[in-house]
C-alpha cells in the first residue's frame, strides 16, 4: 500500500511525469506506454520487461531517448538461464492450460470438449510448441488434468530430458514443419511456447494451417510478447482476450501473468 511505501521512506508523487522528472532510475514491470516516451530523459535508467522484438515503435522511441534500457527478459546468468523471465514464464505456462481448457467450452466458441475427458470418453489432445519453461509448465498442467500431450522442440537434448521427467501421457517429438502439419488435424488445444532470447518468435503455424484444424480448436500463443509463433496472432487484452479466424479460437493476451497478480508479484520478488 502507499502507507507501507511511506513507512519505508518512499515519497509518493501524484503523476508519472513527476516521477520521471526527478528519478535517475525507473523500475517498472511492463514496457513504457507511448504517453511516457516524451518523459524519458537521456541517461535515465529504465529497468523493466521491454520485449523489444514485438514493437518497432517502442524500440525506436527508446533509441531516440538515449536512455539506458535494461530488459528483464534478457538478463542472463553465467549458465544462460533467464532469472527474471523464468518466473513469469512459469506463471504463463500454467495459465495457458487453464484458459485453454476454459475456451474449449462450447459457450466460449470451443469444441465443447473436457480437457481430461471422463471414464469411457477420450481426453483432449494438446500440442505444446516449445519445450522451455513455458512449454514444460503447460505440459505438466495439461498432463495433470489427464490430457494427451505432445511437446515439440528442436533441441533433442531437451526432449530427452522431458521424456524422462514427464508422466506417461506426455510424448515428445522433434519439431519440423511436417510434424506440426501432421498433428494439427487431431489437436484440440495448441500452446505456443517458443522463445528465442531477445528475438522475434518464428511463425510455426501459418495462416493457411488454420484450415487443417477442426472448428473450435483453441490456440493460446504465450509467445505473443515476442511477436507470436502463430502467424494469425495479434495481441489481445484481459478485457477482450479472444477472437476467431476460420472458426479457430485465438487467445493472445500479452502479459498473461497480470491476471494473477498475487502469484506473479511474489514469483517476481523471489527471482
Regions found by a protein language model. Name each.
Residues 2, 59, 97, 138-139, ...:
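Generic hydrophobic/aromatic pocket-lining and core-packing "Φ" positions
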Residues 22-23, 187:
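An anion/phosphate-binding loop that grips the pyrophosphate of nucleotide cofactors and donors
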Residues 25-103:
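Phosphate/diphosphate ligand-binding glycine-rich loop within oxidoreductases
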